[in-house]
């Protein structure tokens, strides 16, 4: 909407309806996939806009989700009922192509998918079909399935997603601010220092390695 209004205004069209239709966020349903610290932070901020919050995360207890003012649901319910679907999942065998052809066919035609997690959690071909056949309305991607930075050379034409007007793509930079860069570096340095001192790091993803070291 903002892009359409801006483009029209720059071309000499002064009309408040150039960005229409616009629908308010309040009262809409936001579904969040994966409810770790980032997912919880998203929920906390989204609540201020008056959205209904649903969460799918089989590794988080229902009571923990409910304490955050969210409704725990299964995958199908989340996909069917979400107006905004936030993908914040890590990349695992279980989450690979979490959204693919079957899932997009279940979604609302006005749904918007936003992926600020890992690119391969969404099937690129299925997403393209969903966007071009009006199965969903739009998508925001901070990381497509194949990240261009992982290729020695790339051309936007290699991925048809980049050609669509109803897709917003950022270069894996949705987290970025000068402050966040500083905090990320400080956090990494702090965890390395803990390991050197023989302490347990704060966020181990493979704690079994720590157990072997202790033995």
Which stretches of residues belong to each language-model region?
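A residue-identity detector for tryptophan
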Residues: 14-16, 154
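Rossmann-like dinucleotide/phosphate-binding beta-alpha-beta segment
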Residues: 17-109
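Rossmann-like dinucleotide-binding domain for NAD(H)/NADP(H)
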Residues: 101, 110, 116-215
């Amino acid at each position: 909407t903002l892009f359409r209004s801006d483009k029209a205004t720059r071309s000499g069209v002064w009309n408040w309806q150039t960005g229409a239709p616009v629908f308010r966020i309040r009262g809409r349903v936001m579904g969040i996939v994966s409810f770790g610290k980032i997912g919880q932070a998203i929920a906390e901020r989204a609540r201020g806009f008056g959205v209904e919050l649903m969460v799918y995360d089989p590794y988080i207890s229902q009571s923990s989700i409910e304490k955050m003012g969210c409704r725990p649901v299964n995958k199908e319910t989340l996909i069917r009922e979400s107006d905004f679907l936030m993908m914040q999942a890590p990349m695992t065998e279980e989450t690979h192509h979490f959204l693919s052809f079957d899932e997009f066919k279940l979604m609302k035609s006005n749904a918007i998918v936003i992926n600020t997690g890992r690119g391969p959690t969404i099937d690129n071909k299925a997403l393209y079909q969903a966007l071009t056949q009006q199965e969903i309305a739009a998508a925001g991607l901070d990381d497509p399935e194949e990240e261009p930075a992982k290729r020695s050379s790339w051309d936007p034409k290699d991925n048809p997603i980049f050609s669509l007007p109803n897709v917003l793509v950022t270069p894996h930079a949705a987290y970025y601010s000068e402050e966040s860069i500083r905090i990320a570096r400080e956090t990494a340095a702090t965890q390395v220092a803990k390991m050197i001192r023989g302490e347990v790091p704060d966020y181990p993803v493979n704690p079994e390695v720590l157990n072997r070291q202790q033995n």
